[in-house]
Amino acid sequence: MISDGGKRMIEFENISKRYENGYDALKHVNFSLKKGEMAFLTGHSGAGKSTLLKLIALIDRPTNGKILLNGHNIAKLSNRKVPLVRRQMGIIFQNPYLLDDYTIFENVAMPLMIAGYRHQEIGRRVRAALAKVGLLKKEKFYPQSLSGGEQQRVGIARAVVNKPAILLADEPTGNLDPELSAEIMALFEQFNQVGVSVLIASHDLALITQLNYRL
């Protein structure tokens, strides 16, 4: 784990989230993740793990409190500026949500295409990301031809292709067997070793306890 002198990448200050039905997903939460740190969010279903990640990713907004990203409050960021902030993040879900009509290469390239990267740069970055997750030879395959573990690795490649400062993962091993789960966690460790801040929500305590990271 690489940590940048204790500087905080993410900080929650008294964050609460209440939904329209009156349910309090989070109440007065204070939390921080250092630059270059890898940590886990644990807890039972409904404990607010996914909500916390959605607030960081600006998929949802808090009811009260501050969310600091590199010292800047993003809790009330205008919608116009959200895409710029999200480019600093890679987001991975339990279901990778791959597009069935697009090849693996095209799925991974999607964030770069949206951001307006040149064709040559897209090719270089996509192939580097696929090589990192061990799927370069399958760049022309379609998602339905891959196993569940391979599809999750495609999701990870797509999340890191724009070289984010932060990786957020919501139950990334939830549908995988123990061996594949360990492989996915090893990938997160590799990205963390080059300075990426990693925050993973997981209820898999058996797997987490094998790893020496903050809970």
Where are the regions a protein language model picked out?
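Helix-to-loop junction immediately C-terminal to a conserved catalytic motif
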Residues: 57
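Conserved ABC transporter NBD signature motif
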Residues: 65-73
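ABC ATPase NBD coupling module
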Residues: 74-90, 193
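Short coil-to-helix segment of the ABC ATPase nucleotide-binding domain corresponding to the Q-loop/switch region
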Residues: 102-109
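Conserved ABC ATPase signature
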Residues: 142-146, 150-152
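A short, proline-enriched helix->beta-strand linker immediately N-terminal to the Walker B motif
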Residues: 161-165
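Catalytic Walker B motif of ABC-type/P-loop ATPase nucleotide-binding domains
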Residues: 167-170
